[in-house]
Every structure is written in C-alpha cells, then in structure tokens.
Amino acid sequence: MMPLLLLAAASTDLDALDQAVARCDRHAANPVFAGEAARRSQFLLDAYREQEAIVADRLALADQRRAVREAGPVKASDQKQFDLQAAALEDRQKALNDKRMLEGIRQDAMDTMRRYFLTNCPAGKAIGK
C-alpha cells in the first residue's frame, strides 16, 4: 500500500506545481524548482544502493547454487529455495526499474514545467496575470 501512497503524493505534487506554473505563482513554484537538484541526487543515491544490494544478493545466490552443485546432487527442496530467492530478486529488480521509469517521467515533467515557467512568467510579473 505504501508505494501507491507515494505515487499518489508525487502525482498530487506535480498537479499542484502545474497549477502554480499556469498561474505564474513564483512563491509556490520556486521552492519546488530550487529543491529539484537535491531530490534528484537523493533518488540516484537510493537507486544505486538498491541496485548494488540486488547485485550483491544475486552473486551470493550464485555462490550458494555453485556450492550445492559441487557438493553433489541438488535436492528438490534446495532447488525450490533457490528458485524462490531468484524470484524475489527479480521482483526487486522490476520494482526498481519501475521506480526509475517513473522518476524519469517525473523529471521530464519538472523540466518541461520549469522551461514553460521561465519562458512565460517573466520576473516581476504579478501572480495570476
């Protein structure tokens, strides 16, 4: 449920920013644009850490499989456990890929709104005009 709440919050934030940009509301838009670089950096760090953890877990799983194969015939229970671990890793990778895709779309939207704002809302223009 938590990822759905985060998606809804991000969508709401973009909607609010879009409305502020349409009104040339500098008081609402400028803080969002100013915080964007830090937000992007944090997202990249978080995505890197998660990808690094997935890779480490994949390597550990491969080492476990190799050790079991070298010890002799693989038991069905061991194979099932390996399959479950591999499926969990695949789910984590898909979730990370989805987050990266959504973040890319969000960044494109932010960049487009910022360009529109800079082009159509000259400094000193009254709010809503």
Regions found by a protein language model. Give the residues of each.
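Sec-dependent N-terminal signal peptides
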Residues: 1-10
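Generic alpha-helical structural signal
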Residues: 6, 43-44, 50, 78, ...
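Immediate post-signal-peptide N-terminus of mature secreted/exported proteins
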Residues: 10-59
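Low-complexity, intrinsically disordered short peptide segments enriched in small/polar/basic residues
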Residues: 18, 29-30, 40-42, 51-52, ...
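C-terminal amphipathic alpha-helix
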Residues: 21-32, 88-129
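Prokaryotic Sec-type signal peptides and long signal-anchor helices
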Residues: 37, 47, 86, 120-121
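Mid-chain, structured segments of secreted extracytoplasmic proteins
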Residues: 53-102
